[in-house]
Amino acid sequence: GSCSFCAIHSHQGRIIQTRSHESIIREAKKITELPNFKGYIHDVGGPTANFRHPSCAKQLKVGVCRDRQCLFPKPCPNLDTDHSDYIALLQKVRALSGIKKVFVRSGIRYDYLLADKNDRFLDELCRYHVSGQLKVAPEHVAEHALANMGKPGKSVYLKFMRAFNKKN
């Protein structure tokens, strides 16, 4: 994302570091074995839940682009917006013995979600991984402030809000 006000890329780097499904599944299994575990995994996500992988194949070869951000002012044509890996991970965790519910409580990038060619992730998210409310970060509604922040305009948030409300 690299929003201009956010420190995440400063201390974690601009290339997203991915944990393997196996690592997350192992950790979830350990959690289910805890004596006080009640069946709820409260978050499967990272700093931005739905950004699990480097943004594009180019990042793995030559690093991040110096002259642009992946999502601002509009999504890069090379941006990999497919959420199917994250969907598969959530399904695997959800299928573990002893799990009642798996939540996604890390903030999601709604502009990244909307850039996906299909709405399968939004379906999955609303059906299985939220309690009716979802954590997103519409930091402002004034267009000039959003532009200075490196965030999409208010219309993108409203489009997401309509899509979420329709599914939820």
Describe each region flagged by the PLM.
Residues G1-R19:
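Canonical Radical SAM [4Fe-4S] cluster-binding loop centered on the CxxxCxxC motif
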Residues K30-N168:
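Conserved SAM/AdoMet-binding glycine-rich loop
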Residues C3, I24, V136:
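Conserved, mostly hydrophobic/aromatic
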Residues T18-E27:
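Short cysteine/histidine-rich metal-coordination sites, predominantly Zn2+-binding motifs
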